[in-house]
């Protein structure tokens, strides 16, 4: 049997950026008994069960609803983005919001919002390389 290894491996730029932002939030917050704030993600930060389990073990809370955000929390918006209304509700909660949305996803979200606001119909196709 021939085994071929992919030329590239690992996380895409957007996921790497989201994980970096989460690490920075954890580092800024302290750890263990000295943690200052609750660190949360709204939904899973990325789609990787092993990574999610490792952050949960470090005390990161995965919110399943925007209603779970509290004033004083630090809440990261996941790499794959959230609907604009969910982001607005999170910001109204009094939590510190860190937008970890992939820049490519955010660009698409803004294009969609601008197109639909002007009454245009929108057909969206994905990036074949992502």
Question: How does the language model describe each region?
Answer:
Residues 1-130:
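The feature marks the mature, well-folded catalytic cores of soluble enzymes
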